[in-house]
A protein has these predicted regions:
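Beta1/beta-strand and adjacent pyrophosphate-binding region of the FAD-binding site
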Residues: 7-16
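Short hydrophobic core segments
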Residues: 14, 172-182
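N-terminal Rossmann-fold NAD(P) dinucleotide-binding loop
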Residues: 20
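Glycine-rich FAD pyrophosphate-binding loop
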Residues: 32-50
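Conserved N-terminal/central alpha/beta ligand/cofactor-binding core
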Residues: 45, 51-137, 142-143
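A conserved short coil-to-beta-strand element within the FAD-binding core of flavoproteins
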Residues: 140-153
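Flavin (primarily FAD) binding-site architecture
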Residues: 179, 184-194
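Conserved small/polar residues in nucleotide/adenosyl-binding loops
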Residues: 208-214
């Protein structure tokens, strides 16, 4: 409720592209110990699978140039761009976090910031390690299959996820869920539609400055 109520359970973030990764990063930094679920592979595994694809043409659906930790831009040339107008300095904060995790300092002041593919993968790995050090939890090859609601108030009470390697399902209790599934999320949107979760297309983005309290 606007940051005024103490969380009863750990927040869950679905998707480890830029939105999900940074969301989990901030939550972990402020002591909320998020659980981050990613359907694809960690960046090291992605790199091996991508190299194998270029050599053999064998494509792994959940681990490739477009899919996995870091999102679709991980194997781009590392150019940084945003079309979001940001009066409160969040774009600058993103660049600072990149630098803190291994990106070159010149991205803070050059007109067209550029990290480079190899460095970008290192940055993503370093961000992941910090999330873990700060008490977060990350599950790769894991797909959210259901959102659970309370019967009367229709408030989120948890999710069900499947370990895609073990083919096992588990339930997590949470009242805070952030969905950042990126592309190839048809099953997620279909499930939300069946659950009668209100959805709308993005129109414009406006920011309100929020200050998160540090958990003792």
């Amino acid at each position: 409720a606007g940051g005024n109520e103490k969380l009863k359970s750990r927040p869950v973030v679905v998707g480890c592209g830029p939105a999900g990764l940074f969301c989990a990063y901030f939550l972990a930094e402020y002591g909320y110990q998020p659980v981050l679920l990613e359907q694809g592979a960690p960046v090291e595994e992605r790199q091996k699978d991508v190299e194998e694809f270029w050599k053999t043409g064998v494509l792994k659906p959940d681990s490739n140039v477009q899919f996995g930790e870091g999102g679709a831009g991980t194997f781009s040339d590392g150019k940084l761009n945003t079309l979001i107008k940001d009066p409160v300095g969040r774009n600058r904060k993103v660049l600072e976090i990149f630098v803190e995790n291994g990106a070159p300092k010149d991205i803070l002041y050059v007109n067209k910031p550029h990290i480079g593919t190899d460095i970008l993968r290192t940055v993503i790995r370093n961000m992941r390690e910090k999330i873990l050090v700060w008490g977060g939890e990350i599950h790769f090859h894991t797909q959210m299959t259901e959102v659970l609601f309370t019967e009367n108030t229709r408030r989120i009470r948890g999710i069900v996820y499947e370990d895609l390697l073990k083919k096992e399902k588990e339930e997590i209790q949470t009242e805070t869920l952030v969905l950042a599934p990126g592309h190839s999320a048809r099953e997620t949107f279909a499930m939300l539609f069946e659950k009668k979760v209100p959805m709308e297309a993005k129109s414009s983005v406006s920011y309100t400055h929020l200050t998160l309290p540090t958990i003792a």
